[in-house]
Amino acid sequence: GPEALQARVFVDCTGEACVARTAGFATAKGDGKTRNPPGQLPPSMMYFLRERPEPVPPQLVEGWFTPVTCEEDLPMTSVWPDGPGGKAIKLKVPGYDSTDTESLTALEIRARQRMFEVLDYFQRVQKKPWRLGHCSPIIGLREGARIAGDYMLTVDDVRAGREFDDAVAR
């Protein structure tokens, strides 16, 4: 249930500005126009495939997903050859609001659906002997809500190693 917490200072390390939003502080997300504008990372899903010594027939029921027919239909999908016991695949799923529970639920569902679409492509089209090993239990959120502070850190600040008097960590 609800709790009351008291402290002189709170440091919001939730990654989604949850504490700041709950306390009524100003937050921002995206560029104010789109959920994942260019230059920002959309949520991503990691999953791992096991390589089988024998051919693997497609595992998925048709009709639940839209079949991927060519590599061009795999945007924002990365395959690493050195996953645990096989391959590791990361796919990004843009266009959802991670601060809204209904949108976040839809994102979780779409990410898993997309995971199976990609797996089906590798099994059916590429004839890869891969089976699903395991996947991340939740989507990886990268850039959702952030605290609207007095100053926004820039790439140049990071590259220059700029220091700030009010830094939280050193």
Which residues are covered by each model-predicted region?
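Flavin (FAD/FMN)-binding glycine-rich loop and adjacent Rossmann-like elements that form
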Residues: 1-9, 13-170
